[in-house]
Amino acid sequence: MQDAITAVINSADVQGKYLDGAAMDKLKNYFASGELRVRAASVISANAATIVKEAVAKSLLYSDVTRPGGNMYTTRRYAACIRDLDYYLRYATYAMLAGDASILDERVLNGLKETYNSLGVPISSTVQAIQAIKEVTASLVGADAGKEMGVYLDYICSGLS
């Protein structure tokens, strides 16, 4: 896992040069949005269970996946889905704080699509639930922070699609 600062510095270091104007601008933007990201992470942390619960209600609860024969029908499968959605929310929050999506590749996406396909987990329902998490989160943290968080939730969706 790296953060935006490490990414900028590593890029310059690999090239053997000092930070240029574009690199400095990336750092300025990262620091300027720091308070917003920390406040959003605090709200998300305090409301994570509610965010996941509302997202499931919006996207999955009354769909075919929760009916008999659906992929989330048994209590065990439903609990696994809730666990996974909480996991995505948590790691997207980490990525937002770091200003870098690399943790999502390392700890969430590597092999996830293949695992879901082998287990018969419907990717489209998962993506729909993550999009619902994005909506619920934005309603709690506000438009600007919601947009920032949305970048990382969309990244997960893209990685699954």
UniProtKB/Swiss-Prot annotation:
GO terms for biological process: photosynthesis. Contains one covalently linked phycocyanobilin chromophore. It comes from the Bacteria. InterPro entries: Allophycocyanin_b (IPR006245), Globin-like_sf (IPR009050), Phycobilisome_asu/bsu (IPR012128), Phycobilisome_asu/bsu_sf (IPR038719). (2R,3E)-phycocyanobilin binds at C81. It is a peripheral membrane protein. Keywords: Antenna complex, Bile pigment, Chromophore, Electron transport, Membrane, Methylation, Photosynthesis, Phycobilisome, Thylakoid, Transport. Light-harvesting photosynthetic bile pigment-protein from the phycobiliprotein complex. Allophycocyanin has a maximum absorption at approximately 650 nanometers. This is Allophycocyanin beta chain. It comes from Synechocystis sp. (strain PCC 6714). The lineage of its organism: Bacteria, Bacillati, Cyanobacteriota, Cyanophyceae, Synechococcales. The gene is apcB.
